[in-house]
Amino acid sequence: MRTPRSLRSTPAWFSRAGWLVVLALVALAVGAFFVLRRPSVHSTATLVVPPPRGLAIGLDEENANLLGTTGAAAFAPWRERLGAVEPSFVRLDVVWSKLQPSADAPPDWGAQQSGCLRDLPPCAPYDGLRGQLRALAEQQRAHPGRFVGYVDLFGAPPWATVPRHGCVPPGVGPTALALSDAGLAAYRRFVSGVLSLARSEGADLRYWSAWNEPNQPAFISPQRARCATDAQALSPASYAALVRELQGALAAAPGDHRLVLGETAAYDTPRPTALSTVEFVDGLPHDVVCASDIWAQHAYVGTEGIGPVASLAGDPGRAGSATLLADLERVLERRGCPTPKRIWITETGVGGPKPGGPRPTDPAALRGQCRALNAALTAWYRDPRVDTAFQYTFRQDDSYPVGLVDTGLTRAFPTYDLVRAWSTRGFSTDGPPPVPGSCR
């Protein structure tokens, strides 16, 4: 994010070099970066001050009873705990197929949700996406400048997709199939509807991702023309079409809305049914890969590799996925976009030795998980290209157990204390916080 500021005329004794030093120090102090323009009677000079290194914290949570400042009484203590994290960003997963299952009816923005987590209590109903946006707006009013909305779209309604073709793994459902031409037009209308709904509820949805994990067959299929690593990659073109439709919808809407590219699953090498992150970036058209200066990458924390078969996370499993991120940074540079990419880690978390696998919850294991996540956050803080890390999720999803509090809302894990400590630093450029006592 760059904010232009006009500079007043400077005294003759104050050199341009002096301005550069002062401005760089100011940028480092406030944890921001700016595009600075100095007016002249002859010309306009533009100075870009690079962003300082640092790390902001985002959070993924869908339950409006937890996300807002009001809601069901049973959720109140945990709602307060989420609010105390004060994340810079909140990531909302918007599942198109659930909101508009039929082409003959408009999206049901208020479709009642149980508030359970995959049928597990505690439960309390809320009004679907409308309720989520209302809750987000409450937090944005209570915490100005924080809880900024980031939308991640996925889940194609079967009526909007192409027939099965190419390499589609047997377990992949119809909501993962690529969109047809008519489906792409409907997708743009759907995005426009979400934008309109957010305006009516007063929620700031600043950042937008066209599709979740587009290099993963459970979200876009086919990934390849046939199930072999040397087969033609198809998913980059499917994703590019989505990005262009999203660009059109955002450009037509009032307000400040920004595109985020990627949301890629952390596949470090090509697989027969999935593209590696590097392979996916290489396959994108130039206009798409250069359409934003932010690339979103998933990187969970674990201790074991995942083997040769594509799974939901796909992570190499090492803290911070340092090798994968280095490869990502190199391929993004190689694509030659005018503006260097910033990297957002839009899904992370820690649980078992294998990301997404069974999570030990004995005290020693939980402390070890906390220290492992802290190592990843510290590595990303030190990486000058990484700006943000999003915890997935607040309330633990038992199908992917890396949350900050348990599914039944009876206990907070040590990682809650850690994420809160990172998030509540004065500025994202402040150094890593002390490791909480619960993690030691």
Would you name each region that the model predicts?
Residues 7-25:
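N-terminal Sec-pathway targeting helices
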Residues 25-36:
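Hydrophobic alpha-helical membrane-insertion segments, chiefly the h-region
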Residues 54-58, 89-91, 146-150, 205-209, ...:
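Structural preference for beta-strand elements that scaffold enzyme active sites
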Residues 67-83, 187-197, 273-285, 370-379:
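Short, acidic/polar
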Residues 85-269, 302, 350-353, 395, ...:
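Substrate-binding cleft and catalytic face of glycoside hydrolase catalytic domains
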Residues 110-112, 200, 214, 219, ...:
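Aromatic-rich peripheral "rim/lid" segments of glycoside hydrolase catalytic domains that contact
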Residues 141, 184-197, 201-206, 230-366, ...:
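Noncatalytic carbohydrate-binding groove/subsite architecture in carbohydrate-active enzymes
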